[in-house]
Amino acid sequence: MAKIVKIAPSVLSADFAKMGEEIESVKSADMIHMDVMDGVFVPNITFGIKMVADARKITSLPLDCHLMIVHPEKFVQKFAEAGADYITVHYEACGEGLADTLKLIKSSGVKCGLVINPDTPVEKIEKEIPLCDMVLVMS
């Protein structure tokens, strides 16, 4: 299997007051990475569904919504409707419900990604990898 490398700048480093300009400045990228943080699963809070919907209005680049939130399954459909092209979730947030969450993402019409922390053994996600369009190991 060939390795595919994609360039996906994160809007987390952008000036949110100039989001349109910031996204325009990376228009040659393969996709835009959007880190959605809830202040519970991770200590920071970023943005939610509206920011994704607003980004969708100003770019045709694929949007990768990286959900760093508890109970991501509750928000999959809303992020898909907002314009996400990929929804990536953490094994650590889904636990035993991981396969069901990945299937829910697929059934919502978007591509799914799986994220693991560096200390999570790959064996924990081996059987779910075939369900995924992308796998990300945090750094």
Regions found by a protein language model. Give the residues of each.
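Histidine/lysine/aspartate-rich catalytic loop segments that bind and position anionic ligands
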Residues: V115-S139
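Conserved N-terminal beta1-alpha1 strand-loop-helix module at the mouth
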Residues: M1-T88, E92-D100, L104-C112, I125-C132
